[in-house]
Amino acid sequence: MGEIKVSPDYNWFRGTVPLKKIIVDDDDSKIWSLYDAGPRSIRCPLIFLPPVSGTADVFFRQILALTGWGYRVIALQYPVYWDHLEFCDGFRKLLDHLQLDKVHLFGASLGGFLAQKFAEYTHKSPRVHSLILCNSFSDTSIFNQTWTANSFWLMPAFMLKKIVLGNFSSGPVDPMMADAIDFMVDRLESLGQSELASRLTLNCQNSYVEPHKIRDIPVTIMDVFDQSALSTEAKEEMYKLYPNARRAHLKTGGNFPYLCRSAEVNLYVQIHLLQFHGTKYAAIDPSMVSAEELEVQKGSLGISQEEQ
């Protein structure tokens, strides 16, 4: 049990990448926690947004791999926000504080929904250059919990944890998926009542994405085709919403592929970010991009333009 928590990779990550805490709101209790790794010269990094049960370190395998390839990566943990507008306003202030004009966002589950809402919120003065949506959704009504969204703040922590755990895989899983679930349960245990209640509120509060406001943003939809908390209908809705999105399909990986199928997830992230190499919105250090990769990028751009 708890293999990931005691793994050399995780311990090396915790020992080398500092966890920063930043306050951008008037309320001092609203603290953003984040890992910022890779070259600071990159002004359009990739930012990871976790699911309800996650902390910033659930993306440690992406941080280690992507920074090794020259990318700047930031993984976040949310303060306690109770509605989407408050979250979006706080996230905008955080980007201002970090002096980041535009960013790429990778959002897992709730993180993906919040990434879309932030892109929608800033559509008149865009802050989101691209989106990678992993096991995500575009309408909170799929959870049939909108009627309870206003009462999560009243519930004790053990009850909230029970609600979240109800979405974790209960059937047979392979050892890597079992380790990922153990790690996420451990992360869930580290969250306080208000953190959990606010995230569940954001996850279930009646809201949907307005696609016409973000239709020009490049999107990759990353889906897992075994047991995950998302229904097939929710996935189909995402495909309809983003008809031009790239699709990254993983045969297995459950709810947490970034932990148990990290090599595949990292490859799909690289493929997504490749389209921005050689531009001012590249998330990678230019010295790490080979001339050959730039040529491949130009070639693939030429092909996609011919197809249009």
From Swiss-Prot:
UniProt GO molecular function: CD4 receptor binding
Primary localization class, coarse: cytoplasm
GO CC entries: cytosol; endosome membrane; Golgi apparatus; intracellular membrane-bounded organelle; trans-Golgi network transport vesicle
Subcellular location: Cytoplasm, Cytosol; Membrane; Endosome membrane; Golgi apparatus, trans-Golgi network membrane
Record keywords, A-Z: Cytoplasm, Endosome, Golgi apparatus, Hereditary spastic paraplegia, Membrane, Neurodegeneration, Phosphoprotein
Tissue/organ expression: Expressed in all tissues tested, including heart, brain, placenta, lung, liver, skeletal muscle, kidney and pancreas. Expressed in J.CaM1.6, HuT 78 and HeLa cell lines (at protein level).
InterPro entries given in the database record: AB_hydrolase_1 (IPR000073), AB_hydrolase_fold (IPR029058), Maspardin (IPR026151)
The keyword Membrane appears for this protein: yes
Illness association: Spastic paraplegia 21, autosomal recessive: A form of spastic paraplegia, a neurodegenerative disorder characterized by a slow, gradual, progressive weakness and spasticity of the lower limbs. Rate of progression and the severity of symptoms are quite variable. Initial symptoms may include difficulty with balance, weakness and stiffness in the legs, muscle spasms, and dragging the toes when walking. In some forms of the disorder, bladder symptoms (such as incontinence) may appear, or the weakness and stiffness may spread to other parts of the body.
Self-association and partners: Interacts with CD4. Interacts with ALDH16A1.
Function according to Swiss-Prot or TrEMBL: May play a role as a negative regulatory factor in CD4-dependent T-cell activation.
UniProt-recorded name of the protein: Maspardin
Organism of derivation: Homo sapiens (Human)
Gene that this sequence comes from: SPG21
